[in-house]
């Protein structure tokens, strides 16, 4: 194996180069050139930046090591790839490439190449950077604009949180991480771990099996308040405290707010919680603009059927200076989750991811 000056080791007759990044091996097609630097890590693995020498474009490359070792994680990877390949919107992250090695037998690690962004909303909220009302409006507008497109494709994101909203230095925002997304006409109860607790809608906390795009709107309401306040709105330590924090602000739900709960146990549980009055948003948050609070309050409604929709949210006065119906496209065709319906094992999923990677060969 020939070693290059930049530390890379040539493989497959120089068509691929192997780099060591913080002890992680990245084996990339040779068009991706250094500097190869780590820019983030998550439960799935590590993300690096590199440059595509053919387009001169900087990209982010996520390595999912041993991607097919277990079925749940493998399906999550397949779902993310299929969904993002289907979508094409300014406020949804784009997949640029999937790097696969020439030998299918060695296809164990998946490298997904995305457009490169500079930061995420979690980091911005936690920073000392001043956020004006214009910033807050623009962030919220882009989240809703992207979500309108996602919901129009019959997709629920289900894991919206500040760290899944990435930005560049122009404040352009894109929604990422679709590994937990589902179709909006699916009724099966979600079994796997979904949505960071702090952004989880009441119907999910109470295990309702019927959920809609309203779960994403709740998350957006929590994120919006976090942008405005620079701190988490409902930082529950567990499910019980999460519901308690929600009812302390919104007040105890009355019977008509619990129609969405099919389970008698869930209804009983909510009814036995201490009865509390709704707090006035304007009194509790006097430093936030009334128009912003009015919109947040319409998103943060206990009963999902009474929660504002993404289309209604875009028409609210707070976003009047940005809202332009003709500039808020929908997805031309709904996304099909058919591949979820067959009983796929790890090898089947591997084959499907391999096929997805071939689509990028001719691009």
Curated annotation (Swiss-Prot):
It comes from the Eukaryota. It is an enzyme of class 2 (transferase). Residues 33-319 form the Protein kinase domain. InterPro entries: Kinase-like_dom_sf, MAP_kinase, MAP_kinase_CS, Prot_kinase_dom, Protein_kinase_ATP_BS, Ser/Thr_kinase_AS. Keywords: ATP-binding, Kinase, Nucleotide-binding, Phosphoprotein, Serine/threonine-protein kinase, Transferase. GO terms for biological process: lateral root formation. One of its GO terms (molecular function) is protein serine kinase activity. It catalyses: L-seryl-[protein] + ATP = O-phospho-L-seryl-[protein] + ADP + H(+); L-threonyl-[protein] + ATP = O-phospho-L-threonyl-[protein] + ADP + H(+). Dually phosphorylated on Thr-191 and Tyr-193, which activates the enzyme. A motif (TXY) lies at residues 191-193. Gene3D superfamilies: Phosphorylase Kinase, domain 1 (3.30.200.20), Transferase(Phosphotransferase) domain 1 (1.10.510.10). Belongs to the protein kinase superfamily. CMGC Ser/Thr protein kinase family. MAP kinase subfamily. Interacts with MKK6. The TXY motif contains the threonine and tyrosine residues whose phosphorylation activates the MAP kinases. This is Mitogen-activated protein kinase 13. It comes from Arabidopsis thaliana. The lineage of its organism: Eukaryota, Viridiplantae, Streptophyta, Embryophyta, Tracheophyta. The gene is MPK13.
